[in-house]
């Protein structure tokens, strides 16, 4: 028996390792990792340069708070800013955390502009994550069930319906949260 919380209905396979785009189960069978570890392992599994970089970093310092300067983070931030043309970057661990930050930044922007109840436009049937704010933004009742009351401030419109977006556009709309590549929803 596993003592892990049952957050998903697990499939009857256990992977032991991966190489490139393949993962291997306990019997040694290989599978194409078409999910890329749910978009976490987009560089593949066990790439020698990535393994070395992680091992080197773990051999120096594994983690410290971002209240301290971290040279490698600053170098990555500089490179991402140069490539994107942006002034600053926000590094995080997951898409859900990125969406939470986007929601908070949009609301903060709204409040700075004097908007008491900033609204964020989201798409029906979209998936944005499983934290309280992101599942509130998610347009799937099944994902939201049991977590009420949900976070307010989201306005839903159908995908690919510009007229619907224009109809709800109001002075309190501060952002559109849209994930153009949908893996769930």
Regions found by a protein language model. Give the residues of each.
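Short, acidic, Ser/Thr-enriched surface-loop or helix-capping motifs
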Residues: 25-26
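Active-site-adjacent loop/helix segments that line or gate small-molecule/cofactor pockets in enzymes
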Residues: 1-22, 67, 157
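Glycine-rich loop-to-alpha-helix module at the N-terminal edge of alpha/beta enzyme cores
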Residues: 2, 30-115
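Conserved PLP phosphate-binding loop immediately N-terminal to the Schiff-base lysine helix
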Residues: 179-185
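Short secondary-structure boundary/capping elements
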Residues: 15, 46, 72, 157-160
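PLP-dependent aspartate aminotransferase-fold enzymes
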Residues: 77-175
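A secondary-structure boundary/capping signal
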Residues: 19, 34-36, 123
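Short, glycine/acidic-enriched loop or turn micro-motifs at the edges of active sites
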Residues: 36, 161, 182
């Amino acid at each position: 028996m596993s003592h892990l919380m049952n957050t998903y209905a697990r499939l009857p396979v256990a992977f032991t390792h991966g190489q490139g785009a393949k993962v291997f189960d306990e019997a040694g069978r290989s599978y194409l990792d078409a999910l890329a570890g749910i978009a976490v392992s987009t560089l593949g599994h066990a790439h020698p340069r990535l393994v070395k970089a992680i091992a080197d970093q773990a051999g120096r310092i594994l983690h410290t708070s971002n209240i301290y300067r971290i040279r490698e983070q600053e170098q990555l931030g500089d490179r991402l800013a140069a490539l994107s043309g942006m002034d600053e970057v926000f590094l995080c661990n997951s898409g859900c955390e990125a969406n939470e930050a986007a929601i908070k930044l949009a609301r903060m922007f709204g409040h700075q502009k004097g908007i008491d109840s900033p609204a964020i436009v989201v798409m029906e049937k979209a998936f944005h994550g499983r934290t309280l704010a992101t599942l509130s933004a998610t347009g799937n009742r099944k994902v939201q069930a049991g977590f009420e009351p949900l976070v307010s401030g989201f306005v839903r419109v159908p995908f690919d319906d510009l007229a619907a977006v224009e109809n709800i556009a109001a002075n309190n709309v501060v952002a559109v949260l849209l994930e153009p590549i949908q893996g769930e929803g």
